[in-house]
Amino acid sequence: NEVLRRVGDDNNRPLLNVPDPRAEIERLLAVRREAYAAIPWQVDTTGLSVEEVAARVIEIAGVVTLPVRYPGGAPSGLAESTAGRPQGGQYEIYIGDRVLAHVGSLLRAAGAPEGSRVAVVSNPVVAPLYGAQVEAALRSAGFRPFACSIPDGEQHKTLTTVATLYEQFLAGGLDRSGTVLSLGGGVTGDVAGFAAATFMRGIRFVQVPTTLLAMVDASVGGKTGVDLPQGKNLVGAFKQPALVIIDPTVLATLPAEEIHSGLAEMIKHGVIAAPDLFAELEKGIRYSPFTTHHAPFAVRSSQIARALRVKIEIVEEDPFEQGLRAVLNLGHTVGHALEKLSDFALRHGEAVGIGMVAAARIAAELGRANPSLADRIEALLAAWGLPVGCPPFDADAIWEAMAYDKKRRGRSLLWVLPRAVGQVEIAEDVPPRVVRSVLCSMGARCEG
């Protein structure tokens, strides 16, 4: 109808100079459907003025696209059958304001078949905000989406939650041609990704992170998983997404404390390999926009992209965390222990920030970094509203919690120690007395 309306009385249309123009249009659309679907960026101009169409095209032109390459196979030392060996490939990360509206066309361009089911996995906080918009965008691209809900919070990152997702997938008619789309933060992405990796031995997975922490960290790299009572992420799988869609405008509904938590991961990436990003965040303190409960559009696409490039370069070189990728765990050895001891009342970014300060002070105690480095990291974290002291947990309890950390080599804990902004090293020769001394100096409860 729309095509016929636009053509009107224009007779200079040879293909429509037939007895039944409507039937000819339907035939042409059917022939061209797959070609059209392969175009990632599409603008429905129905009812829009020229100015409105131009504005949408300009918006698309501002989207940052980051390719991520990954190899086939599995981590070294793990058995795998030739038939079941994952193939290597590439996916794209799209970063831009209001890119959420294009999730359907981007998924079609990534190879998802028209008419297939899409399980939109979210939580009761995020789903009312963005669920309908995502499902509408999927329907407009010819998909059949359905909503799946999981509880919000790290305490629900369990095998039990994954099992409830399997039930929802089956009830929604999801099959091997379908897609699991995570709409939420890091917990949602970890659980949904693990479910996608294991349901029917693995189906397509898409990440749509809605927290800054997930945007710059959890949504990229293919790590998915759940916790056990003994520790975080002890059960999981590597599952590369088909694509990642990052829309910074959704941060408008995120509390400032959650923005700060994500900034801790951005600061971490700066310490690891992006001194320019670290310096930019230091300069940003002078005009901090985080003065209200919500912080709309405070973080730019370019900053998110810069933080992501650090992780992308590392995970492309070490996709299965066999060596170099371990540097991304800066702050996580102490951080994960503090999260566990707080029953996850401590946000992940907050815990990682404290862990970074601890790692920098350990490096200084060992003579591997100037003490001023720890002061600089601590000052930046504190300026963005993040805690820098250790909660008053017993130092021995913190050490015991670290005993179940995945970052081990034999009986030795692996530590990521900063030597300078933009330079870190992996160490396993850190004496327990040094760790204890640093934790005590930062506020841990110590006796004797």
Predicted feature descriptions by range:
Residues 187-194, 215-216, 337:
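Short glycine/serine/threonine-rich phosphate/pyrophosphate-binding segments
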Residues 280, 284-287, 293-396:
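Active-site segments that bind and position negatively charged phosphate/pyrophosphate groups
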Residues 71-89, 286-301, 447:
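Intrinsic disorder/low-complexity segments
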Residues 1-33:
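A glycine- and Lys/Arg-enriched "phosphate-lid" helix/loop adjacent to the NTP-binding pocket
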Residues 258, 264-267, 368-448:
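C-terminal charged capping/lid subdomain of soluble metabolic enzymes
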Residues 30-70, 433:
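NTP-dependent small-molecule kinase module
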Residues 62-81, 87-179:
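ATP/NTP phosphate-donor binding region
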Residues 40, 194-284:
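A glycine/threonine-rich phosphate-anchoring loop and its flanking beta-alpha core
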